[in-house]
């Protein structure tokens, strides 16, 4: 098994070096694929991993420390490091799986008809922020009220 994995790793290293130098119909490889997201080649791994939904600064630092990978550019990864990185990121909840989980939790709040669920249903903030003058992100763009007249100028 080890011999097969080692040969797969060397084959992967060769393909990666070819992909760095080869263009296909004028297109170049811009990054590596980790956790169903594209990690750019020209960014350090610590910031590049943050492109994956559900991985922020803290978790990317934890992943790299656990693997013992320094904060180098994504294009400088060896095949073994890339395989280990994909396996490590795969152990955490990320991407579409995390989006589905968050959506189902919000749907559960709406179905239970608790306060937070009703705020989600009406598109209002649910953590106590004021809504009289702010909350534009949640409520959307401000709409003018028809029939409201401006005060006359003196």
UniProtKB/Swiss-Prot annotation:
Main location, first listed in the record: mitochondrion
Biased composition (Basic residues): 136-154
Residue stretch of the organelle transit peptide: 1-30
Pfam families listed in its UniProt record: Ribosomal_S13
PROSITE patterns, A to Z: RIBOSOMAL_S13_1, RIBOSOMAL_S13_2
Molecular function terms, GO-annotated: rRNA binding; structural constituent of ribosome
Keywords: Mitochondrion, Ribonucleoprotein, Ribosomal protein, RNA-binding, rRNA-binding, Transit peptide
GO biological process, one term: translation
GO cellular component: mitochondrial small ribosomal subunit; mitochondrion
ATP-binding found in the keyword field: no
Region ranges (Disordered): 121-154
Annotated localization: Mitochondrion
UniProt cross-references to Gene3D superfamilies, sorted A to Z: 1.10.8.50, 30s ribosomal protein s13, domain 2
PANTHER family: 30S RIBOSOMAL PROTEIN S13/40S RIBOSOMAL PROTEIN S18, SMALL RIBOSOMAL SUBUNIT PROTEIN US13M
Role this protein plays: Located at the top of the head of the small subunit, it contacts several helices of the 18S rRNA.
Assembly with partners or alone: Part of the small ribosomal subunit.
HAMAP family: Ribosomal_uS13
Similarity remark: Belongs to the universal ribosomal protein uS13 family.
Protein name: Small ribosomal subunit protein uS13m
Gene encoding the protein: RPS13
